[in-house]
C-alpha cells in the first residue's frame, strides 16, 4: 500500500513484515484475545455487573428460574387471515 510520510511517497512492501513493532503488536493482540476469552467464560452474569439489576430485585431468587417454553402446537397455522389453501390433490374446487 502506498502512503505519504513527510512529503515523500512510500511503499509499505519495502518494510520487513518481521519488524519489532509488528512482533510486539502481534504478541499483545494474542495476549488480549486470551484475556478476553477467559473473561467471557468466567463472567457469565454481565447484567448484574453492569447495574441492570441486582440480586435483590430479581424475580427468580428462589431458584425456580424463568418459566419454560409453551408446548409446541402441531397442525395447520390457524391464526392467519386469508383464503383457505387449495386441496392437496389440486383441482378447481368444484
Curated annotation (Swiss-Prot):
> Where is it mainly found?
endoplasmic reticulum
UniProt xrefs under InterPro entries = Se_SelK/SelG
The annotated region (Disordered) lies at 48-94
MF term (GO), any: identical protein binding
For this entry, list what GO says about its biological process.
Answer: calcium ion transport; endoplasmic reticulum calcium ion homeostasis; establishment of localization in cell; intrinsic apoptotic signaling pathway in response to endoplasmic reticulum stress; macrophage derived foam cell differentiation; neutrophil migration; positive regulation of chemokine production; positive regulation of defense response to virus by host
Domain of life, source organism: Eukaryota
Q: Where in the cell is it found?
A: Endoplasmic reticulum membrane; Cell membrane
- Return the annotated site residues (Cleavage): 81-82
Q: How is the protein disposed in the membrane? A: Single-pass membrane protein
Instruction: Give TM segment ranges.
Output: 20-42
Keyword annotations for this protein, in alphabetical order, are: Calcium, Calcium transport, Cell membrane, Endoplasmic reticulum, Ion transport, Membrane, Selenocysteine, Transmembrane, Transmembrane helix, Transport, Ubl conjugation
Post-translational modifications reported in the UniProt record? Cleaved by CAPN2/m-calpain in resting macrophages but not in activated macrophages. Macrophage activation up-regulates expression of the calpain inhibitor CAST/calpastatin, resulting in inhibition of CAPN2 activity.
Quaternary context:
Interacts with DERL1, DERL2, DERL3 and SELENOS. The SELENOK-SELENOS complex interacts with VCP. Interacts with ZDHHC6.
Q: What does this protein do?
A: Required for Ca(2+) flux in immune cells and plays a role in T-cell proliferation and in T-cell and neutrophil migration. Involved in endoplasmic reticulum-associated degradation (ERAD) of soluble glycosylated proteins. Required for palmitoylation and cell surface expression of CD36 and involved in macrophage uptake of low-density lipoprotein and in foam cell formation. Together with ZDHHC6, required for palmitoylation of ITPR1 in immune cells, leading to regulate ITPR1 stability and function. Plays a role in protection of cells from ER stress-induced apoptosis.
Question: What is the name of this protein?
Answer: Selenoprotein K
Amino acid at each position: 500500500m502506498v502512503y505519504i510520510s513527510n512529503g515523500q511517497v512510500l511503499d509499505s512492501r519495502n518494510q520487513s513484515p518481521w519488524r519489532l513493532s509488528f512482533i510486539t503488536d502481534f504478541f499483545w493482540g494474542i495476549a488480549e484475545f486470551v484475556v478476553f476469552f477467559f473473561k467471557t467464560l468466567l463472567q457469565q452474569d454481565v447484567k448484574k455487573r453492569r447495574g441492570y439489576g441486582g440480586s435483590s430485585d430479581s424475580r427468580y431468587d428462589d431458584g425456580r428460574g424463568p418459566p419454560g417454553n409453551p408446548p409446541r402446537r402441531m397442525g395447520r397455522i390457524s391464526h392467519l387471515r386469508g383464503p383457505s389453501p387449495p386441496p392437496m390433490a389440486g383441482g378447481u374446487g368444484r
